[in-house]
């Protein structure tokens, strides 16, 4: 089942307020799908103060949105640019993009593998 390393897995971690514009930016460059997660993280911005029922508390993590995209190797530069164009505010906490190699992708319904499994089809 090895697809030859031509498929990448891109993790895009952004502010929750940027998830919808990132989804739109990916659609505009013909990225057919993504898996979305609500996540929490910390980095240079070490948390924030919140209030709950009148009490103030400090949390050491920040809410983030994460999109996971399996794509062709050639799509990665366009994905990175599209995300940076819409998610960059110039402030700490804008997020990160992680790019990994996938050893394979299998479409459960058809058994297609590799790039064939991630290519959007009209009937999928």
Model-derived regions, located:
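Positively charged, small/polar-rich N-terminal and surface patches that mediate targeting and assembly
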Residues: 1-124
């Amino acid at each position: 089942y090895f697809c030859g390393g031509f498929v990448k897995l891109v993790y895009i971690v952004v502010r929750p307020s940027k998830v919808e514009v990132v989804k739109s930016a990916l659609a505009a460059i013909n990225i057919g799908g993504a898996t979305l997660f609500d996540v929490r993280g910390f980095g240079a911005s070490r948390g924030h103060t919140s209030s709950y029922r009148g009490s103030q508390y400090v949390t050491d993590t920040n809410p983030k949105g994460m999109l996971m995209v399996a794509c062709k190797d050639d799509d990665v530069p366009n994905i990175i640019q599209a995300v940076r164009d819409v998610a960059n505010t110039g402030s700490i906490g804008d997020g990160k993009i992680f790019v990994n190699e996938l050893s394979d992708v299998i479409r459960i319904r058809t058994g297609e593998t590799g790039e064939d499994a991630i290519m959007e089809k009209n009937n999928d």
